[in-house]
C-alpha cells in the first residue's frame, strides 16, 4: 500500500499541469493504471473476477 503522504500529494494540484499523475483510488498504486476504468491492474483483476465491473469477461481461446 502506498504511503498516505504520497496519496495526499497526488490529490493536490501541482504547480505545473504536466506533473499530474494517476493513482489507483483503492490501493494508491501509481503504476499500471488503467485510464478506462480508473484503477490499477491488480484492483482491476480482483474486481473483474468478483464480477464488480460490468461488461468485463474473462477471455479464453
Swiss-Prot record:
Protein function: Binds 16S rRNA, required for the assembly of 30S particles and may also be responsible for determining the conformation of the 16S rRNA at the A site.
Gene3D superfamilies, A to Z: 30s Ribosomal Protein S14, Chain N
Protein keywords: Metal-binding, Ribonucleoprotein, Ribosomal protein, RNA-binding, rRNA-binding, Zinc
Recorded family membership: Belongs to the universal ribosomal protein uS14 family. Zinc-binding uS14 subfamily.
Record GO cellular component, one term: cytoplasm
Residues where Zn(2+) binds: 24, 27, 40, 43
Listed GO biological process terms: translation
Cofactor note: Binds 1 zinc ion per subunit.
PROSITE patterns: RIBOSOMAL_S14
Species annotation: Syntrophobacter fumaroxidans (strain DSM 10017 / MPOB)
Pfam families per the UniProt record, alphabetical: Ribosomal_S14
Co-factor(s): Zn(2+)
Stated name of the protein: Small ribosomal subunit protein uS14
Gene Ontology molecular function, alphabetical: rRNA binding; structural constituent of ribosome; zinc ion binding
Complex and partners: Part of the 30S ribosomal subunit. Contacts proteins S3 and S10.
